[in-house]
UniProtKB/Swiss-Prot annotation:
Residues 4-52 form the F-box domain. This is F-box protein At2g26160. It holds the Pfam family Beta-prop_KIB1-4. InterPro entries: KIB1-4_b-propeller (IPR005174), SCF_F-box_domain (IPR051304). It comes from the Eukaryota.
């Protein structure tokens, strides 16, 4: 039996193949092979953006973005670039964002041919934009969200977020869902961050303890003890969760006040801790090795530094609140 041409493969088989890819970039690659494949392979499904709310004057919108590693067509180059994209709707183009600021970059007439570049998905990140129509109507010219929740994770059809009250909230996504946002019970502490780690959801409280979120029943269970905090000489310590070398770790971003700028603080250092499960004790990570840590507003993750242009190992990249620029610090 003669082998059929790629363009003549059954449409059902092409669509079945495309549906096995979880990455949007992989599905787009399948669709870009030829016109018959583009017609047969379904457009990647996007998340249900509008989330249910009991208050008709308040609209909550899920805003997902995706981090990618892109390498050029040259086979001799193994280094790539870190990019961030956002697609507003299924029919819209994919927009390029600043990886750290989530801002839309200057539009370009050029397009990225996925057949000429290696594009690999790193991770997805989420924010929840809250539009309070009472507040928006009261401010002339205001069009953006009233509030932004930047500590958000997505697991199956469940969305978890650290709310404005520093508590963990949960909501079902999907058109068939009519549930409103629900606050998880038995919360004894306020929370700073939330993360999806090995298929489980964990949250970080103010004391530096990590809590595991049980889905059935929906509740919080303490997973680790608090981190001893002895930071004399610093004005504040911002804490974040990150996965490093398979371990769940806590980042401490140490800050000092700027005397000449009101309500402004500068970052003067970082500390990273991981739990030693054998002795049930927090230990400090002295070096990131060949890794670099990316600290964005809504996402923290590590990359292999040698795989990216201009990226140095054992480094932490973050945004300086005063200069509004990306800063690098050695751990």
């Amino acid at each position: 039996m003669e082998k059929p041409e790629w363009s003549e493969l059954p449409g059902d088989l092409i669509n079945l193949t495309a549906n096995r890819f979880s990455s949007i970039s992989d599905v787009l690659r399948v669709r870009s092979i030829c016109k018959p494949w583009r017609s047969a392979a379904a457009t990647p499904k996007s998340f249900q953006c509008n989330l249910p709310s009991s208050n008709k004057m308040i609209e909550t919108v899920l805003s997902p973005t995706t981090f990618f590693r892109v390498t050029g067509p040259s086979s001799c180059s193994y280094k790539g670039w870190l990019i961030r994209t956002k697609q507003v709707s299924e029919s819209s183009k994919i927009n390029l964002l600043s990886p750290f600021f989530r801002q839309l970059l200057t539009p370009s007439q050029q397009t990225l041919d996925l057949l000429k570049f290696e594009v690999s998905e790193i991770r997805q990140s989420y924010e929840i934009h809250i539009f309070d129509k009472y507040l928006i109507q009261g401010v002339i010219g205001k069009e953006g969200p009233s509030h932004i929740l930047s500590r958000v994770v997505f697991l199956d059809n469940l969305i978890f977020a650290v709310g404005q009250d520093d508590k963990i909230w949960c909501c079902k996504s999907g058109e068939e869902s009519s549930r409103i946002w629900t606050k998880i019970k038995n919360q004894v502490e306020d929370f700073l961050d939330i993360i999806l780690h090995k298929g489980q959801v964990y949250a970080l409280d103010l004391t530096g303890a990590i809590w595991w979120i049980s889905l059935s029943p929906l509740s919080l269970l303490q997973f680790t003890p608090s981190i001893p905090m002895d930071y004399d000489g610093y004005d504040s310590c911002n804490k974040r969760l990150v996965e490093y070398c398979g371990d769940l770790c806590i980042i401490h971003q140490l800050r000092l006040k700027k005397a000449y700028i009101r309500r402004s603080q500068r970052t003067v250092g970082f500390k990273v801790y991981k739990m030693d499960e054998y002795v049930a004790k927090w230990v400090e990570v002295r070096s990131l090795g060949d890794k670099a840590l990316i600290v964005a507003r809504d996402s923290c993750f590590t990359v292999v530094a040698s795989e990216y242009h201009g990226c140095l190992n054992n480094s932490i990249y973050f945004v300086d609140n005063v200069r509004k620029s990306v800063i690098r610090m050695k751990l």
